[in-house]
A protein has these predicted regions:
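Conserved PLP-enzyme active-site core in the AAT-like
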Residues: 1-22, 84, 101-102, 115, ...
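FAD-binding core of FAD-dependent oxidoreductases
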Residues: 1, 44, 48-50, 216-223, ...
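Structural preference for beta-strand elements that scaffold enzyme active sites
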Residues: 133, 215, 357, 384-388, ...
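Active-site-proximal helix-loop-helix substrate-binding element of RNase H-like nuclease domains
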Residues: 471
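Short glycine-rich loop/turn motifs that provide flexible caps or phosphate-binding loops at active sites
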Residues: 61, 218, 280-283, 336, ...
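Non-catalytic terminal extensions of PLP-dependent enzymes
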Residues: 14-20, 26-45, 49-278, 290, ...
Length: 662
């Protein structure tokens, strides 16, 4: 009943054309890139990478392992509860699993406990009312339990006896105790040795195409290299073992990294303040709009509630504006993909008394450097409103220009795009916001610092664990390297545009005839003349070993391509060869040389099981389907399923039984 109201991504079952079950992203038309201001949420970054890690944990341990771990955690918690009560502490949680909270005896203070705990290198939770608490997890062993005992015993002036073992005990009331089985699917009951688990993960890995195989040309996504040197800190416990709420003097290294990174981002954006708190670009948009609202309220302009957004903007812009409590007003774009200046002036004038902000992307979502960008900012400022710059395309700005110079007041950055932290598989994302001087006082705070204004994340610095990646990227590249990367990103996009302009054609170009860091390939004429859609081209690319570009965004019936600076000339040339060979295949359909109802494009992709089948009833050869050009032979990536039935997947979102569509 409510499936279309669910936020974020939904993965559901469907079947390919041969009846093989498969997964796909379902009900995509309900998401913000289609629904825009009518979307349920602005969520883009699903953080699926973290969910995958948790999933592997459950797969490896299974029901029995998880139960054993949980029982051990709870037993230690029960033991500590009983022992601390003997010391005069009162445990206030009637029902608990792993977390205890104690009222202290009259002669014991929280500061006493804090002093003793710190001397033993233990951090506890200290509540405002003087209570003290802690949580147990699977890393807590008998030795750690003895340390906790000693802290509370010493504070209370009690003797304590070290224990060598803790018996299995339960204090969970039967009314809330689970009795039904869980993790019953076969995947949670097969891979309980490291060898089997390793092979299972590798089998899954072989089904995914990634930058390890070839360029991922997704427009507006900036799928660049995540260099090994930048990733190394993620394996260091000094970074990964840090709790986000530890005392400041225990995180001096992190604080220095955060300070230096923030200073770097200020210089890069031309702004005066930074918050690293937002956990995604969409969260950054929301946070930035909250900052604008807080500023307007502070100067008596809190009635301003309208946000002007170009029609070309990414769908998260209007979705975030709605989430932040604003009303959106759409501004038209001209035939060249630029903001229609006449319409902008009219909309700004009509709404000037209520206008809070303009949200604009630069270069535009059409991949164009709009020459009027500074004039656009001036028009908005003249109305008393602020300019929010979407930093999704910052990869075409770094070192050449910046939002501050252009005239924006706030922007977000996608560290998982422009600044090289992992992007595929759902993040984890970081979407810091950078602001001009007058907005600095309204940046997100956090309760740990005694100021929770505009807080958008549970942790004060968001996903701080992956900040070392961006820090390493910026420091190793330096100003000259970052600028060169921007130039190469723009050069690569224009190289592809030049190579493909005489076949497919490029939808938009800037005033000087060039594109920005990405370009939109025209596919609508192909569909009219040959009956081949942009979807067919994207599916056929899989046979050549390439991930699909961005389909039908921001223009329906097109493909948006962004090569990034990471790709070599050899890889760009190979991609061009592939696209030109697909163009040749399209012409074969158009000219009647290939069957319009049975050709390599409308039947793509061709999985291995189809190619090796005894049954082959197509009008073209197996070789043409699987090895259309010589370069594919050296690095063939076999797609796992044939073309998927999208309608079935949306209509039958969940099977009634596992593996069936009855």
């Amino acid at each position: 009943e409510y499936k279309r109201n669910m936020p974020g991504r939904i993965i559901g079952w469907s079947k390919d054309k041969y009846g093989k079950l498969c997964y796909r992203m379902a009900l995509q038309t309900r998401e913000q890139h289609i629904k825009r201001e009518k979307a349920t949420s602005n969520i883009c970054t699903a953080q699926a990478l973290l969910a995958t890690m948790a999933g592997f944990y459950a797969v490896y341990h299974g029901q029995e392992g998880i139960t054993t771990i949980a029982s051990r955690i709870h037993s230690i918690t029960v033991f500590l509860d009983k022992q601390l009560k003997k010391f005069g502490y009162t445990q206030v949680n009637a029902q608990y699993f792993d977390t205890l909270r104690f009222e202290l005896p009259e002669h014991v203070s929280a500061q006493q406990i804090r002093t003793i705990a710190l001397s033993k290198e233990v951090n506890l939770r200290y509540f405002e009312n003087g209570n003290v608490g802690f949580s147990i997890d699977e890393t807590t062993d008998v030795a750690a339990a003895n340390v906790l005992l000693s802290i509370f015993a010493i504070a209370a002036g009690k003797d304590y006896q070290k224990v060598d073992d803790i018996p299995e005990k339960s204090n969970i009331d039967k009314t809330v105790k689970r009795t039904t089985p869980f993790l019953t699917h076969e995947v949670f009951n097969k891979y309980h040795t490291e060898t089997e688990m390793m092979r299972y993960i590798k089998r899954l890995d072989r089904k995914d195409i990634s930058l390890a195989q070839s360029m991922i040309s997704l427009g507006s996504c900036t799928m660049k290299l995540n260099a090994a040197a930048e990733m190394l800190p993620l394996s260091r416990p000094e970074f990964m073992g840090m709790h986000p709420l530890v005392p400041e003097d225990q995180a001096e290294g992190y604080r220095e990294l955060i300070k230096n990174l923030s200073e770097d981002l200020k210089v890069i954006t031309g702004f005066a303040g930074v918050s690293l708190q937002p956990n995604s670009g969409a969260a950054g948009e929301y946070a930035g709009l909250r900052v604008i609202r807080a500023y307007l309220e502070s100067i008596g302009q809190g009635h301003r509630n309208k946000v002007l957004i170009p029609a070309s903007a990414h769908g998260t812009n209007p979705a975030s504006a709605i989430q932040a409590g604003f009303v959106t007003v759409t501004c038209a774009c001209d035939e060249q993909g630029n903001v229609e200046m006449a319409d902008l002036r009219v909309k700004a004038e009509e709404n000037k008394d209520e206008l809070a902000a303009l949200m604009i992307t630069y270069p535009s979502t059409h991949g164009i450097f709009e020459t009027e960008i500074k004039e656009i900012c001036d028009i908005i400022h003249a109305c008393g409103a602020q300019v929010y710059m979407d930093g999704a395309n910052m990869n075409a700005q770094v070192g050449l220009t910046n939002p501050g110079f252009i005239g924006a007041d706030v922007c977000h950055l996608n560290l998982h795009k422009t600044f090289a932290s992992p992007h595929g598989g759902g993040g984890p994302g970081v979407g810091p916001i950078c602001v001009a001087e007058h907005l600095v006082p309204f940046l997100p705070g956090h309760g740990i610092f005694g100021n929770s204004q505009n807080q958008v994340s549970a942790a004060p610095f968001g996903s701080a664990g992956i900040l070392p990646i961006t820090y390493g990227y910026i420091r190793m590249m330096g100003a000259e390297g970052l600028t060169q990367a921007t130039k190469i990103a723009i050069l690569n996009a224009n190289y592809l545009a030049t190579c493909l302009k005489d076949t497919y054609g490029v939808v938009y170009r800037g005033a000087n005839g060039f594109v920005g860091h990405e370009m939109i390939l025209e596919c609508r004429k192909v569909h009219e003349e040959a009956g081949i859609s942009e979807n067919d081209i994207a599916k056929r690319l899989m046979d050549y070993g390439y991930h699909a570009p961005t389909l039908s965004f921001p223009v329906h019936g097109t493909l948006m391509i962004e090569p990034t600076e990471s790709e070599s000339l050899a890889e760009l040339d190979n991609f061009v060869d592939v696209m030109l060979n697909i163009w040749k295949e399209i012409q074969e359909v158009k000219n009647g040389e290939a069957d319009k109802d049975d050709n390599v494009l409308i039947n793509a992709p061709h999985p291995e099981y189809e190619i090796v089948s005894d049954r082959w009833e197509h009008s073209y050869t197996r070789e043409k389907a699987a090895y259309p050009i010589e370069s594919v032979r050296d690095n063939k990536f076999w797609i796992n399923v044939a073309r998927v039935d999208n309608t079935l997947g949306d209509r039958k979102l969940l099977p009634t039984r596992y593996g069936t569509f009855e």
